[in-house]
């Protein structure tokens, strides 16, 4: 009646463990890169757009309060139905769930770093006539890097 369920051949052989570990690392890496891009973009817009800030932070707070496991059935069903009969749907679902498990905290961390940056640092970029692009790459991203990295590691520590 419905779409065929993907046939997943999982071998119990010890020889396959490195391959399965590699797949897990790739999933985590892809989800991390997507989370980082989203968190930086979302946090930057929320920090520098006063009109959108209150709404964006409220949405982020609501999304952060929803447990990741509550997304599991819907996400996996949606991904398997979008790409029926393929392993890709399950992999995309796993990546999306890893993404939702870490992105909200990373976005809050980046936003908080931008909001708590000392005024003197911003003034220094004005004195040296940095463009917005230079200010982002040479001040804001490095300044928030430690907080975002720590948040990412803290999220994984709690998930494992």
Regions found by a protein language model. Give the residues of each.
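Hydrophobic alpha-helical transmembrane segments of multi-pass integral membrane proteins
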Residues: 1, 29, 33, 37, ...
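Conserved small/polar residues in nucleotide/adenosyl-binding loops
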Residues: 151-159
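Generic hydrophobic transmembrane alpha-helix motif, especially the helices
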Residues: 61-101
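Transmembrane-helix boundary motif in ABC transporter permease subunits
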Residues: 31-61, 73
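N-terminal, non-cleaved signal-anchor transmembrane helix
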Residues: 1-33, 88-91
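Alpha-helical membrane-protein architecture signal
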Residues: 14, 18, 52-56, 92, ...
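Short cytoplasmic-facing helical segments at TM-TM junctions of multi-pass membrane proteins
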Residues: 109-148
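Alpha-helical membrane-interface segments at transmembrane helix boundaries
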Residues: 18-30, 60-64, 145, 149
